[in-house]
């Protein structure tokens, strides 16, 4: 990773900082030069995953979407340098509201509105001209992928609560949900897949920038909305969820017909 930076920059960095893990097998570093300019170095263990991110980042850059740019890639394809989108995540910015059990201040709600208002542009503009065959680990959200998520919920959450439930009825409900989610593929767009507050960085003006989209694929856009509004630990009140949903739908109308019935 250090060699890649030196080859690209022409000199050694002034400082190197390893960043906290992000729940994946990738390792992140922040490189700074003598002028204080920074880049993020990424070391991954999967070439296929790296290739997906590199392709998506370049595609989104062509679409002028608020994502990082990849500026250098190692010959092994296991390391790359990307632009640094800041130190503060949306998750960090919402800490006070979380600590108050979901009683978010006006400024925090405004950050949430700005973030979810950007989602339709990523989904629909991002899908234009995108070669989904280059996505990883799959090109589109199919029934198998839906059941993977549903079973993760069943075994890693529901069964750990000790609640009694009818597994047969649950499987039937899962089947109906999978059918609804897969739905009409012609209405699918880019599915971010992991659209949550930890993957949103805020620039100096408080504008959202988006990272960690390497698992994106073609899929139902509703998935990302649910991921954001019902993400663990944020404690959004029903009224706030309704408000953010309305913000998303208003933004989505620029790109697609919206049925709120």
Predicted regions and their residues:
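An alpha-helical support segment within catalytic cores of ATP-dependent transferases
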Residues: 1, 5-8, 127-139, 144, ...
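Short secondary-structure junctions
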Residues: 5-14, 63-65
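ATP-binding glycine-rich phosphate-binding loop
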Residues: 11-29
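ATP-binding pocket architecture of kinase catalytic cores
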Residues: 20, 29-148, 152, 159
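Active-site acidic catalytic loop and adjacent metal/ATP-binding pocket
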Residues: 25-32, 122, 177-223, 235-236
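Protein kinase-like catalytic core scaffold
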Residues: 27, 39-40, 66, 80, ...
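Glycan-recognition and catalytic cores of secretory/periplasmic carbohydrate-active enzymes
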Residues: 129, 136, 140-143, 147, ...
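Active-site activation/catalytic loop segments of kinase-like enzymes and analogous catalytic loops
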Residues: 151-160, 222-258
């Amino acid at each position: 990773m250090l060699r890649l930076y030196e080859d690209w920059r022409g000199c050694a960095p002034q400082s190197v900082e390893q960043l906290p893990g992000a729940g994946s097998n990738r390792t992140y570093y922040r490189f700074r030069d003598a002028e204080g300019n920074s880049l993020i170095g990424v070391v991954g263990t999967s070439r296929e995953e790296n290739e997906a991110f590199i392709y998506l980042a370049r595609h989104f850059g062509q679409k002028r979407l608020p994502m990082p740019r990849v500026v250098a890639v190692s010959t092994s394809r296991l390391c790359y340098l990307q632009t640094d989108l800041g130190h503060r995540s949306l998750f960090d910015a919402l800490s006070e509201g979380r600590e108050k059990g979901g009683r978010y201040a006006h400024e925090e709600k405004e950050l949430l509105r700005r973030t979810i208002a950007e989602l339709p542009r990523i989904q629909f503009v991002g899908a234009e001209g995108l070669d989904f065959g280059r996505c990883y680990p799959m090109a589109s959200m199919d029934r198998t992928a839906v059941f993977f998520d549903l079973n993760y919920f069943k075994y890693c959450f529901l069964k750990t609560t000790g609640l009694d439930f009818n597994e047969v009825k649950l499987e039937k409900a899962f089947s109906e949900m999978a059918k609804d989610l897969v739905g009409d593929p012609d209405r699918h767009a880019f599915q971010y897949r992991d659209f949550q507050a930890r993957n949103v960085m805020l620039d100096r003006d408080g504008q959202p920038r988006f990272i960690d989209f390497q698992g994106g694929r073609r899929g139902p856009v509703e998935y990302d909305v649910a991921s954001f509004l019902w993400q663990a630990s944020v404690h959004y009140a029903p009224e706030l969820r309704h408000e953010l949903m309305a913000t998303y739908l208003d933004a989505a109308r620029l790109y697609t017909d919206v049925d709120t019935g």
